[in-house]
Regions:
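A short alpha-helical cap/connector motif
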Residues: 1-111, 118-139, 143-158
Length: 158
C-alpha cells in the first residue's frame, strides 16, 4: 500500500470518528497548491490528527511543517500518524492555543494552512501576515463557515 493510500484510509477513519477533515475537493486543491509552490516551511493551524499535515508533507518532500492544535489527544495522535506515514522527522506539532503560539513563532512560512477555529481567523491575521514572505500563500479553509469566520455566529467549543 502506498503512503497516499494509507493517508486516504486515515482520512476515512478520522471522518468516521467525527474528526473534521478537509472535504475531498478542498484536500485536492490544498495538495495541488502545495505541490505547485513546493514550500520549504509550512504552518498549519488546526492540525487535528494530522491528515492534512501528512498530505502537505507528502506533496512537498523538502518541506518542514509546524502544526498547532488545542486538543492534546489530537496532537498525540497527529504525531503517531506522521510517524506511520514517514513524515514525523519533518514535523513539529505544538499543543496549545494558536492565539498564544502564533505570536511567538519565528521566521517565515512559505505556506500557511489556516484550518483552526473559524471564529478566530480575523484575530490571527495580524500575527500571520509578518510570517508570510513575499510570494507566500495563506490558504484558509471554510471561509466563511456558516458565519463563524466573520463573527456573525459564535463557534461551538469542543
Amino acid at each position: 500500500m502506498t503512503r497516499w493510500e494509507e493517508l486516504e484510509q486515515l482520512r476515512e477513519r478520522a471522518r468516521a470518528r467525527g474528526i473534521p477533515v478537509a472535504r475531498p475537493q478542498t484536500f485536492r486543491l490544498l495538495l495541488d497548491t502545495v505541490r505547485s509552490l513546493n514550500p520549504e516551511r509550512i504552518l498549519e493551524i488546526g492540525t487535528a490528527v494530522g491528515c492534512s499535515a501528512a498530505g502537505m508533507l507528502l506533496a512537498a518532500p523538502r518541506a518542514r511543517l509546524t502544526g498547532i492544535d488545542l486538543q492534546e489527544d489530537c496532537c498525540r495522535e497527529a504525531r503517531e500518524n506522521l510517524v506511520a506515514l514517514g513524515c514525523a522527522e519533518r514535523a513539529l506539532i505544538h499543543n496549545g492555543d494558536a492565539s498564544e503560539i502564533i505570536p511567538v513563532l519565528s521566521g517565515t512560512y512559505d505556506f500557511i494552512f489556516l484550518d483552526g477555529p473559524k471564529g478566530h481567523y480575523f484575530e490571527y491575521l495580524p500575527f500571520l501576515k509578518p510570517l508570510l514572505p513575499k510570494g507566500g500563500i495563506l490558504f484558509a479553509d471554510n471561509v466563511p463557515f456558516f458565519g463563524y469566520a466573520d463573527g456573525e455566529r459564535k463557534a461551538p467549543r469542543r
